[in-house]
């Protein structure tokens, strides 16, 4: 039986962080299709315009144009149930709570790694 292709939306404004996340996703077995958005506004557009729903959204916190909290709220406001995992270098309880309140399903800290993403993929049954 063939493994399901995993579609991920990676929302991150820093190119180096996108490169690291993409490599970690591939190493963890979850990088079949990775679309990128450099800010929250583009992320909302990508989710809205996607031909098929994403299996996972990795959402940065601080970005220009629209931050991760607002993008998460807007995606949830569209009725999208795709797991959203907040990603930030700030792991303060207030930051985690703000993302969860906005509609995120989980939180992980930067830098992303094969191990961290492996746990996330397993949690959402994508591995």
UniProtKB/Swiss-Prot annotation:
| Domain Response regulatory span(s) in chain numbering | 7-125
> According to the record, what happens upon gene knockout?
Dwarf, narrow leaf and low tillering phenotypes.
- Highest taxon of source: Eukaryota
Q: List the SMART domains hit by this protein, alphabetically.
A: REC
Q: Which Gene3D superfamilies match?
A: 3.40.50.2300
Pfam families (alphabetical): Response_reg
Positions carrying 4-aspartylphosphate are 60
- Keyword Phosphoprotein listed? The answer is yes
Q: Which PROSITE patterns match?
A: RESPONSE_REGULATORY
Q: Keyword Nucleus on this protein? A: no
Q: Recount the PTM note.
A: Two-component system major event consists of a His-to-Asp phosphorelay between a sensor histidine kinase (HK) and a response regulator (RR). In plants, the His-to-Asp phosphorelay involves an additional intermediate named Histidine-containing phosphotransfer protein (HPt). This multistep phosphorelay consists of a His-Asp-His-Asp sequential transfer of a phosphate group between first a His and an Asp of the HK protein, followed by the transfer to a conserved His of the HPt protein and finally the transfer to an Asp in the receiver domain of the RR protein.
PANTHER family in the cross-refs: TWO-COMPONENT RESPONSE REGULATOR, TWO-COMPONENT RESPONSE REGULATOR ARR22
The similarity comment for this entry is:
Belongs to the ARR family. Type-C subfamily.
What protein does this entry describe? Two-component response regulator ORR41
Organism the protein comes from: Oryza sativa subsp. japonica (Rice)
């Amino acid at each position: 039986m063939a493994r399901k292709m995993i579609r991920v939306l990676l929302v991150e404004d820093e190119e180096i962080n996108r490169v690291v996340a993409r490599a970690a996703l591939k190493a963890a077995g979850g990088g079949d299709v990775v679309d990128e958005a450099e800010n929250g506004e583009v992320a909302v557009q990508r989710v809205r315009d996607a031909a098929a729903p994403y299996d996972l959204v990795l959402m940065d916190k601080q970005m220009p144009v629209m931050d991760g909290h607002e993008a998460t709220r807007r995606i949830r406001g569209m009725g999208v149930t795709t797991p959203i995992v907040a990603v930030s270098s700030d792991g303060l309880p207030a930051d985690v709570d703000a993302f969860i309140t906005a509609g995120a399903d989980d939180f992980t800290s930067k830098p992303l790694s094969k191990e961290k993403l492996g746990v996330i993929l397993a949690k959402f049954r994508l591995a």
